[in-house]
Amino acid sequence: MKTGTWRVKTGFARMLKGGVVMDVTNVEQAQIAEDAGAVAVMVLEKVPADIRAAGGVARMCDPAKIEEIMDHVTIPVMAKCRIGHVAEAQVLEAIGVDMIDESEVLTPADEEHHINKWEFEVPFVCGARNLGEALRRIAEGAAMIRTKGEAGTGNVAEAVRHMRIIRREISELTRLDKEELYGKAKEYGVPFDLVAEVASLGRLPVVNFAAGGIATPADAALMMQLGADGIFVGSGIFKSDRPQEMAEAIVEATAYYDDPEVVAEVSKNLGDEVAMRGLEISEIPEEERMQLRGE
């Protein structure tokens, strides 16, 4: 089968369905993630909570660090590039990452344009707050969508809101006639065929993971119950006091999200003193909210 085709890209993304992708910053963390059952790791210089705290410009991770992690784990390795930064994406593809996240967690390089992801053989994942954003990213070639949430906060509320918005807007599409779907395609700025496909399927044509503020096993179970195909965990694991236990618990809760007894068991001894502290969304100034980057 030819590499880099839409079928291959989306097929790879579907292989991760039901799993947890964990943010890591070094080999030790990557090995913890792999041992805990993560389906992939996302390599960055700092986890989102530290990016938020440090301020300044957040860029692609050092390629040497990514390659080092690739040499030490057997699961897929992803990495983030800045929104619109084609050269960073080219570097990541050149070193052989398995997927690129064109991410609002990093400082956008282009305030008006995202990367044309069709020009790459490596699959991309992108964030979305609503159906319009999701469809625009898919039209650009994204093989996976994730909620934006509000990364680095340990607060799942925005991820919940974004997942509910996307589900509601998809449900509304399924009730529209052809002329109304043409109107929606124009409103969203995407091809009619893509809107019609979503209306017919009753879901996105790619997998839709939850991300942004997931900090506990119960958070992961909640997002799966809301229809997520899988989970991205950023700061929630390695900002906790017991990373290994938290990683294993979130993997278990994601797999058995519909079994409260399992979620309860893996959540034991992972209370506020263990989970990351978290931020209240309303206390974050609008200009510091990562989710507002890249509409």
Curated annotation (Swiss-Prot):
Q: Which SUPFAM superfamilies match?
A: Ribulose-phoshate binding barrel (SSF51366)
Q: Which UniProt keywords apply?
A: Lyase, Pyridoxal phosphate, Schiff base
Q: What is this protein called?
A: Pyridoxal 5'-phosphate synthase subunit PdxS
| Binding locations of D-ribose 5-phosphate | 23, 152, 213, 234-235
According to UniProt, the reaction catalysed is: aldehydo-D-ribose 5-phosphate + D-glyceraldehyde 3-phosphate + L-glutamine = pyridoxal 5'-phosphate + L-glutamate + phosphate + 3 H2O + H(+)
Q: Summarize the protein's role.
A: Catalyzes the formation of pyridoxal 5'-phosphate from ribose 5-phosphate (RBP), glyceraldehyde 3-phosphate (G3P) and ammonia. The ammonia is provided by the PdxT subunit. Can also use ribulose 5-phosphate and dihydroxyacetone phosphate as substrates, resulting from enzyme-catalyzed isomerization of RBP and G3P, respectively.
Could you provide one GO biological process annotation from this protein's UniProt record? amino acid metabolic process
State one molecular function term (GO). Answer: pyridoxal 5'-phosphate synthase (glutamine hydrolysing) activity
Report the family membership: Belongs to the PdxS/SNZ family.
